[in-house]
UniProtKB/Swiss-Prot annotation:
Gene Ontology MF: a single term: (3R)-hydroxyacyl-[acyl-carrier-protein] dehydratase activity
MaoC-like domain sequence ranges: 8-116
InterPro entries noted in UniProt: FAS1-like_DH_region (IPR039569), HadA-like (IPR016709), HotDog_dom_sf (IPR029069), UPF0336/Enoyl-CoA_hydratase (IPR050965)
Family: Belongs to the UPF0336 family.
Secretion signal, residue range per the UniProt entry: none
Protein known as: UPF0336 protein SCO4636
Lineage of the organism: Bacteria, Bacillati, Actinomycetota, Actinomycetes, Kitasatosporales
GO BP annotations listed: fatty acid biosynthetic process
């Protein structure tokens, strides 16, 4: 079943604030094997001009993908998540994510395309801090593979 094209441009309500913790940043940096001291040492981050430790660039995927759940679970969209694979991910930063940030994400369906029987869904996640300042935009591309013929 094709995805509902009429939903292109639909935005979903902002998520509840997610508080970025130093420990979460450290765990993520270790998990991805990034030893940049700005991710684990507040003094190293301050020496680079940051008020506290900063997160690796892909850290926000964990909150933007969770926010994309509003899109994925929208029954009007018609997405069969059992057929979905992650196709692509991009980020555009206004500033680094920092420990202590309280971030919200607003997800928008940016595009729906069909190609070779597969549906391609592009979701844009706008991330803002509690002051309403833009921090990062994340684009997630999901591919709903065509159903296999019996």
């Amino acid at each position: 079943m094709a995805l509902d094209q009429s939903l292109v441009g639909r935005s979903y309500p902002p998520t509840a604030p997610y508080e970025v913790g130093r420990e979460k940043i450290r765990e993520f940096a270790e998990a991805v094997g990034d030893a940049n001291p700005a991710y684990t040492d507040a003094e190293a981050a301050k020496a680079l001009g940051h008020p506290d430790v900063i997160a690796p660039p892909t850290f926000v995927f964990s909150i933007t993908f969770k926010a994309a759940g509003q899109v994925i679970e929208d029954p009007q969209l018609g997405l069969d998540y059992s057929r979905v694979v992650h196709g692509d991910q991009k980020f555009s930063y206004a500033r680094p994510v920092r420990a202590g940030d309280r971030l919200t994400v607003t997800s928008t369906i940016e595009a729906i395309k069909s190609m070779a029987g597969n549906d391609i869904l592009d979701i844009r996640g706008e991330v803002h801090d509690e002051a309403g300042e833009h921090v990062v935009t994340a684009w997630t591309k999901l591919v709903a593979r065509a159903a296999e013929e019996a």
